[in-house]
Structures are given as C-alpha cells and as structure tokens.
Amino acid sequence: MSAGGEHLKDEGTRRQVVLSGGIAGLVSRFCVAPLDVVKIRLQLQIHSLSDPASHHDVVGPIYKGTLSTMRTIIKQEGITGLWKGNIPAELMYVCYGALQFTAYRTTTQILAQLDPHRLPPALESFVSGAVAGGLATASTYPLDLLRTRFAAQGTERIYTSLLASVRDIARSEGPAGFFRGCSAAVGQIVPYMGLFFATYESLRPVLSGLENMPFGSGDAAAGVIASVLAKSGVFPLDLVRKRLQVQGPTRTLYVHRNIPEYRGVFSTIAMIVRTQGVRGLYRGLTVSLIKAAPASAITMWTYERSLKLLRDFRVAE
C-alpha cells in the first residue's frame, strides 16, 4: 500500500474500489442497524425536553435513552423491530459505499492533475470527500427515505413491502415524494464527508504506526475520530432531514402520530427551536455518535481489507 494520506486516492482498479466500497457499506449497515432505528425514533419525537408537561400531548411511545428505547421496541415490536428498514438501508449502503469511494478516487485523481497549481493535501481531501458525499447522497436518496419511513413504522404497518412502498409513494406523492428533505441531506453530507475524509487522511499516517489500536490498525481509529468530529458539527441537519422524510399523507400514521407539518429546511429548524428549544435539534445525538464510531471503523476497516484482498487475488492470478 502507498504511504501516508495517498492510500485511498491511488490504490486499486475502479472495479476493486467499487466492490470494496459496496462490501464495506453492506457489512457496516448490518452491524449498526439497531442503533440506526433507535436514532430515528428519538429524532422523530417532538415533545419539549425542558417541559415535562408536554409529555401529555404525545401520541405514541416516549423513548428515553438508547438502551431504554431498544427495550421498548423489542417489547412492543419484537427483536426484528430493531432491523426495520434494513432492506432499503442495505441497498442504500451498498450503492452509497461503492459510489462514494469511486467518486472520491476519481476526484482526487482529477485534482492531482492540476500541477503546478495543486491544492494542499488537506483541502484536496476535503473537496474530494465533499464531492463524493454529495453525489452518493443524491443518487441513493430515495432508498434513504424508504429506510426512514420503514424504521418509523410502529406495530401498524403503513407499507407492506419495499415494492409496495415505492408504488404508494409514486402514486400519492409523485416523484418529488422520494426526495423530501434531500436539500438537508446534501447540505449535511457535503461538509460531513469533506471533514471526515480530510481528518481521516490527516490522522491515518499518524495512527498507522501505533500498536494495539482498535481492530488492529490505525485505519479504524482514524475513521472513528474523523466520524465523531464531523457528525457532531452537522447533526441538526440530519434531524431536519428525518423530520422532512416522514412528511406527506402518511405523516400521522407512524409510531409518533403527532409529527408536525414541516416545510423547508430553515422553517423546520425555526419551528423546532421555537417549540422544543435548541436541544430539540440534537435529539438522538448520543446514539448517533455511538453508532458513528463503530460504523465508520467497520466501514474503513472492511474497505481497506477488502481492497487488499482483491488486489492480492489479482496479483496471484
């Protein structure tokens, strides 16, 4: 493997990068699916965190904390409730991972041709990460919306299957229904992925030489730190995205039945701050960070190992 921060930029063929990215997304998603469902349930709660009296207006369960939410879901919906939305999520993560790493590799190779006016390494990684994240997010967004809607279903099923959900949304909401909240998603993911890859590329050379690191390498540790830092900065947009994704004719049918009607990113932020306080923008942040650490570590570790395996297999042929 090449040294330093260039390893993600110039190693492997396009096919190897696509396959490795897809495998990384698939493995990571399955491992953290329960935490993702918990996060979505917490993000969709609308009662005030500072006013206990507001709990009386809640229609649906009240979730408090990661473990408590898991127990409630298992008790009311069974263990499979923790994997609701996993099919569209797996499809999304496989496609997202493949597109993300391919776009990142392609963008960095294009930027490398700008000599003698090449960007500084950190800025180059930021731009490449932002482009990769934006393209992958927009391309896979309908699957992200389906994942959220399935995860938000309680004991009463709104959508009976993946195909049925596609037909229902297309019929009742039109093509635009699949892209509710997309602007918040791109607005979130571009700085997130830019910061993630810039931090990852900066930390990996430093951590790669250290022993006894998680998962046996500096790749995973660098992925954890980069993800936690980037995730915290853009979390309010992630929450807004989830609130917008469940808008439409089925808004009052999810496990939280009194989700308000939101229109647009900025008006949603303003309404949440007005009714739930600034803390309302950070519902689910704890579980999101808990999820981000293993998810990013597993993703980067699996990607690196898959790519190495594919490269070694090609050499052995």
From Swiss-Prot:
UniProt keywords (A-Z) are:
Membrane, Mitochondrion, Mitochondrion inner membrane, Repeat, Transmembrane, Transmembrane helix, Transport
One matching Pfam family, short form?
Answer: Mito_carr
Membrane topology listed for this record? Multi-pass membrane protein
Keyword Transmembrane appears in the UniProt entry: yes
Location of the protein in the cell: Mitochondrion inner membrane
Q: Name one GO molecular function term.
A: thiamine transmembrane transporter activity
Q: Where are the Solcar repeats?
A: 12-110, 120-206, 214-309
> A single GO BP annotation from the record?
thiamine pyrophosphate transmembrane transport
The record lists the membrane-crossing segments as 17-35, 91-107, 126-146, 184-200, 221-237, 284-301
Q: What is its main location?
A: mitochondrion
The record's section on InterPro entries has: Mit_carrier, Mitochondrial_Carrier, Mitochondrial_sb/sol_carrier, Mt_carrier_dom_sf
One GO CC term, this protein? mitochondrial inner membrane
Family named by the database record: Belongs to the mitochondrial carrier (TC 2.A.29) family.
- State its role: Mitochondrial transporter that mediates uptake of thiamine pyrophosphate (ThPP) into mitochondria.
Q: Per its record, how is this protein called by name?
A: Mitochondrial thiamine pyrophosphate carrier 1
Species of origin reads Aspergillus fumigatus (strain ATCC MYA-4609 / CBS 101355 / FGSC A1100 / Af293) (Neosartorya fumigata)
Q: Which gene encodes it?
A: tpc1
